Each structure stands twice: as C-alpha cells, then as structure tokens.
Amino acid sequence: MNSQIFKIINKNNLIKTINNFNKCYYSTSIKKPSSFNKSQNIFDKPLRRVFFNVPGSDRRKIDKAIALSDKIDSIVLDIEDGVAINKKEEAREMIKKSVVEDSFGKAELLVRVNSVDSGLLEADIDMIAKIPTYIDGIVIPKVEHPYHLHYITLLLREKCGDKNAANLKFMACVESAISVINLKDICNYSLGTDTPSQLNALIFASEDYCADTGITRTPSATELLYARSSVVNHAVAHGLQAIDMVCINYKDQEALKKETLEGVHLGFHGKQAIHPNQIEIINDCFRPSLEKFRFASKIVEENEIHQSQGKGAFEIDGKMIDMPMVKWAKKVLSIETFYPPREEEEDQ
C-alpha cells in the first residue's frame, strides 16, 4: 500500500480517514498481508505475565511500581480511565517527567492513552512525541475496528516521525461486543503489505465489556468464557499475546489465584494487575507446576525412544500419547525456559 495515499490527519477529518482506509483495506485490487506464522512462539515477544496498571497522575503509585519493577514485566502508565478528566494534563506532565528521569529497570514501559473517540488522544500523542525513545509502546483502549489502529499509526508518524513511530508497540484493548466481533480484522491490521504490524498483544477488559453487553458478573466468570476464549484464539492465531482481565477483588488472594489459573488454563499469556498484592500470585500462577513439567519431560523422552523404534502412539501412566500430546509437552518445556516450575502440585 502506497503510504502517500493517506494524508496525515487530525481528529477533525477522522471520517475521511475511515472512508479512505475502507477503500484500501477492503479493495480486492490490493494484496492482503500474508498470513501470520501460526507456529510463531509468543516468547519471541517480551514476557508480559504481570501487566501492571498505574494512574499517571499519582506520583506515589508510580514510585511504588518503580520499587517493584524487578517483579513486573510491563508497567502501564495510564492517562485514560485511571485518571480524572481534570487531571489529564497533570498526568501527561508527570509521565513525561518520570520516564525521562526515573529508572524502571528491565520492565517494559507502556503508556495507556485515551481512546480515538474521546477527543483527548491528540494531546496524549503530543506528549508521547516528546518522549518516543523513552517508552516501549502504547496501550490503546476501546479498539473496535482496524481504523482505530490506522488513525493512531498515522498520528504517531506525523508527530514522532516514521522511525520513532514504527518502534512503538501496540497493545489493543478489547472492551465491547463489536470489538470481539471484529477481532479478526483488528489482528490483521498493518499499514501496508511491506510494513510489519506494530500490534503485539490483545488485552481483555472485562468490566467495560460487561457494561457494553449488559452481562452480569458472577464469581464463576462463566459469562465471560466466550469473550475470553475469543481473545486468546485470535491472539494465538495471529502470533500475538493475550492479556487477561483485572481481578477487581484485589484483597481476596484466593479469588485472584482462582481467576488467574482459569486464565492460564484458557491460554492467556499474562494478566492485568492494579495492586502490588496481586503481583506475586500472578507471577506464580504463570509458572507451570512441577507435576506438569515432569509429565511433559517424560512425554518428550519417551517419544524420542519410540520414534527411534519406528513407533507412533504410546502409553504413559495409563494415558495414550500421540503427536498432539507431544507438541503440548514441548510447548510446556519451552515455557519452563522462561517460567521456572512452581513446587506445588497442579491446581485443578
């Protein structure tokens, strides 16, 4: 896609941008981007087990996140829902100062901007344009269509320059019914066939999703199974990471553990956190159990023996093992390289 087709835009002509985008994105005369490699290892991307949200207007909480940065994979400095309307500019100034002057250790540093439709995004991007090399990416809320990513991409290029803009990773928040429906198009978005997608992860925002759909939250969270599974399936199919919802009962450690392990079992690669008390439990839950690791090791070892003997399926501890199970075992062992196994037995 010729980038000259699109003019750098501002909020006032967003509708024109949407129309131009649709003409090009859905045109049969334009070659669509080639399919993602479905076998792509999600660990080619940074670990994002703990995705820690911090209000950008709260200096005390920013300092706390910095102090805990060795236990956090991604620190998200929020200008959106975590900041009151009359504190937005204060948050921008505080974030700008903090990312330049403070050390966040090895943690990935992200800024959560306001949504495309909020009327506040442009001021956020103006701030980011002054610090593009100090952050790793941006969290984009309320992504419902690929043109939301398109608009932000062009805005960043205008304000930050092509090179700095291209180096910023995107994390798209799934917060509504239409967002879930449009996940395939959102995941497939890139500025052109020769431009790698900046999208790295999908983030499920359960409370916003419930507010949009009218779903009533229950302790079991079964009402969210479809949406959570959709996020994971689309993310994995496109080589992206999937970040699970916030556990709002942040003082209930057992509820957090249960919800986090459910996310692990569904295939999520990390979980959002809003309180320091959640960090240790989330980190621990994303480590495979010692029991699972030992079983996976045994499968791989036995498979090598049976393959050398020209045998296919085999049995371990009364369970039939075939190639899908061998692939599962190898994936568990690859995860163990990054997440040392935990001592207790596998949670049910």
Where would I find each of the regions flagged by the language model?
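Expand to "…catalyze enediolate/carbanion chemistry for C-C bond making/breaking, isomerization
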Residues: 2-348
